């Protein structure tokens, strides 16, 4: 049986605060005294904080700064915190009932490795409409919870999971809408290294919470060039 559906992220904050403009040398950080899953330098090196030059009202609460070139920068502390929250949520589910999906090229290998590490179900590449809603389709699967790499690229999965009441965890960039997302992980969801780091951390944290072995290095999750 599926866990109770988490509180949805379907509405952004009523008011959007002005976002400070980033000057040279400034970058996202975590609060003093807090401990991140990996060092801030590792997050920065992977480009997890790098957003796009577009932003949505939904994602503004996760924006740290906007650079002088118009690029929105995500708050690494929020990313780190949301990975922990998502891992805790996922740890309560039977892995065989968890579905991870990615249509994005650079998300497919990390999602595949996440699935392998935790023994979850994965659907990678082009998603055939009806796989979550039509029992007559070959490969039909009704998960208890879904992880999507990009709400835009995985829009059909998002639509079907939402229609059957399945909770959705999504990796969301600054340009994403989150209307059908139940738990947002704010991150660069287009970069090769960013996606590998987020999926690796998520898998590692779920394994830790479930007290199961995790024998994978970050490089195992990186899409080969």
Curated annotation (Swiss-Prot):
Residues 1-33 are annotated as: Disordered. Disulfide bonds: none annotated. Keywords: Ribonucleoprotein, Ribosomal protein. InterPro entries: Ribosomal_uS2 (IPR001865), Ribosomal_uS2_arc (IPR023454), Ribosomal_uS2_CS (IPR018130), Ribosomal_uS2_euk/arc (IPR005707), Ribosomal_uS2_flav_dom_sf (IPR023591). GO terms for molecular function: structural constituent of ribosome. Residues 1-14 have a biased composition (Basic and acidic residues). GO terms for biological process: translation. SUPFAM superfamilies: Ribosomal protein S2. NCBIfam families: uS2_euk_arch (TIGR01012). This is Small ribosomal subunit protein uS2. It comes from Methanosarcina barkeri (strain Fusaro / DSM 804).
